[in-house]
């Protein structure tokens, strides 16, 4: 292979070869003891720490290229690795290694009147293809979660993170080899050739599931072109609604965190809805706190009247995942008005209410049809790690199979085991 070209195999042939190796590895992983899978993750964590200088050097190449290409500050932040972020990756691996293994768990058990014993147990999905963009940490998170859930994975990261992904991938191979597991259990597409994405999406019968992690255009392409099942992680067009009975002290603290803690993650609040019954002076204080934190406010004419710094909001803004220090703001008449706005514009990821009225909060929690609905908490808690699931492979916003943070359990299916003593089914 030279540069970004595939010299000896077509993209379809290359992907088929990787998938066949992954299938063989998945059969071994499906039977691997929990301790062996956990050992591979702990050894990978150790490798990340030992090779941190090499990983950061590789990442510096990607960051320099992104900056030379005048990529957005949000994109560069998602791409950039630091010693602290590497340590977080290593620590996450150790957390996942100690999570309960879902493989083999009994979901349901029953005995039929004829004596048949039926058991429904969790099993790995098989071979999972993961397509993602600028975040290098997905290489480790995705590999760890697929491995611990007994699946083999084929990773196709974004071209902007190619050097970072290759460096991180080597630590995973080292962990697998030292633990005595097949290195083909986790494979990284080694080229930036976009044709490999198409080959993955059409590898029906070879790849069991594709998970896209990235922006709207990536997810849309995957959903349109895929000939294999897709578990989609869509935009995080998240709302925080300040009810008229909200505690102003909580509001300011939570809303600033929900927007500004890390603006480039999918759990960041993108739209702020404020009840008209909430005190105007507290609204001014909240907006000023956001400005002080470096946030650009885009508001309706009413918002601009009380906040001269605010820019005019457009219709397009309400449906935009900024992933940046920008927030759309408007007043709503009451909770029903807030619910109507959320139903129209939310991507079904995470929406939150701030109020001291439990009855109102419970109605909001029951009414909003999003994967995650919160009360008096920052939307930035929309994360598998914060849910106690370890790392996550994404936030699924669909309604079939997994929903919300997808961790180990979300990467399994199930099968029925039937134990008999010679029963036959009577002729009807």
Curated annotation (Swiss-Prot):
Tagged with keyword Oxidoreductase: yes
Pfam families cross-referenced by the UniProt entry: Aldedh
Subcellular localization(s) per the UniProt record: Cytoplasm
Pathway: Amino-acid biosynthesis; L-proline biosynthesis; L-glutamate 5-semialdehyde from L-glutamate: step 2/2
BP-aspect Gene Ontology terms: L-proline biosynthetic process
Enzyme kind, highest EC tier: oxidoreductase
Catalytic activity: L-glutamate 5-semialdehyde + phosphate + NADP(+) = L-glutamyl 5-phosphate + NADPH + H(+)
Record key words, sorted: Amino-acid biosynthesis, Cytoplasm, NADP, Oxidoreductase, Proline biosynthesis
Record carries keyword Oxidoreductase: yes
InterPro entries: Ald_DH/histidinol_DH (IPR016161), Ald_DH_C (IPR016163), Ald_DH_N (IPR016162), Aldehyde_DH_dom (IPR015590), G-glutamylP_reductase_CS (IPR020593), Glu-5-SA_DH (IPR012134), GPR_dom (IPR000965)
EC number(s) recorded for this UniProt protein: 1.2.1.41
Molecular-function GO term, any one: NADP binding
GO CC term (a single one): cytoplasm
Biological function: Catalyzes the NADPH-dependent reduction of L-glutamate 5-phosphate into L-glutamate 5-semialdehyde and phosphate. The product spontaneously undergoes cyclization to form 1-pyrroline-5-carboxylate.
HAMAP family cross-referenced by the UniProt entry: ProA (MF_00412)
Membership in a protein family: Belongs to the gamma-glutamyl phosphate reductase family.
Protein name: Gamma-glutamyl phosphate reductase
Source organism: Zymomonas mobilis subsp. mobilis (strain ATCC 31821 / ZM4 / CP4)
């Amino acid at each position: 292979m030279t540069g970004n070209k595939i010299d000896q195999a077509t993209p379809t042939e290359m992907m088929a070869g990787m998938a066949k190796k992954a299938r063989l590895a998945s059969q071994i992983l499906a039977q691997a003891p929990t301790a062996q899978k956990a050992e591979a993750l702990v050894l990978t964590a150790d490798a990340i720490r030992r090779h941190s200088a090499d990983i950061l050097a590789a990442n510096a190449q990607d960051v320099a290229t992104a900056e030379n290409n005048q990529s957005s500050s949000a994109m560069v932040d998602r791409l950039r690795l630091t010693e602290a972020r590497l340590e977080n990756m290593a620590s996450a691996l150790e957390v996942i290694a100690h999570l309960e293994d879902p493989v083999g768990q009994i979901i349901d058990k029953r005995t039929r009147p004829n004596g048949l014993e039926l058991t429904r147990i969790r099993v790995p999905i098989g071979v999972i293809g993961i397509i993602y963009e600028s975040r290098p940490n997905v290489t480790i998170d995705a590999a760890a979660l697929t491995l611990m859930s007994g699946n083999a994975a084929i990773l196709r990261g974004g071209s902007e993170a190619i050097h970072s992904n290759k460096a991180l991938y080597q630590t995973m191979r080292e962990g697998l080899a030292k633990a005595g597991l097949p290195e083909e259990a986790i494979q990284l597409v080694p080229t930036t050739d976009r044709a490999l994405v198409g080959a993955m999406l059409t590898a029906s019968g070879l790849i069991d599931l594709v998970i896209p992690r990235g922006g709207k255009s990536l997810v849309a392409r995957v959903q349109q072109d895929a000939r294999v099942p897709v578990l989609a992680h869509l935009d995080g067009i998240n709302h925080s609604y300040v009810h008229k009975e909200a505690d102003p002290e909580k509001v300011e603290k939570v809303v600033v965190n929900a927007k500004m803690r890390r603006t480039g993650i999918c759990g960041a609040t993108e739209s702020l809805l404020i009840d008209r019954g909430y005190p105007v002076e507290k609204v001014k204080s909240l907006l000023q706190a956001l400005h002080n934190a470096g946030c650009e406010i885009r508001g309706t004419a009413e918002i601009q009247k009380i906040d001269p710094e605010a820019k005019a909001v457009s219709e397009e803004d309400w449906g935009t995942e900024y992933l940046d220090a920008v927030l759309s703001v408007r007043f709503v008449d009451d909770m029903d008005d807030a619910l109507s706005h959320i139903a129209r514009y939310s991507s079904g990821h995470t929406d939150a209410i701030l109020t001291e009225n439990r009855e109102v909060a419970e109605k909001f929690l029951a009414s909003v049809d999003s994967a995650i609905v919160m009360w008096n908490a920052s939307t930035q808690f929309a994360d598998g790690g914060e849910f106690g699931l370890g790392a996550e492979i994404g936030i699924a916003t669909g309604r079939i199979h997994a929903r919300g943070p997808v961790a180990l359990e979300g990467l399994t299916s199930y099968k029925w085991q039937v134990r008999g003593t010679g029963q036959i089914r009577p002729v009807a």
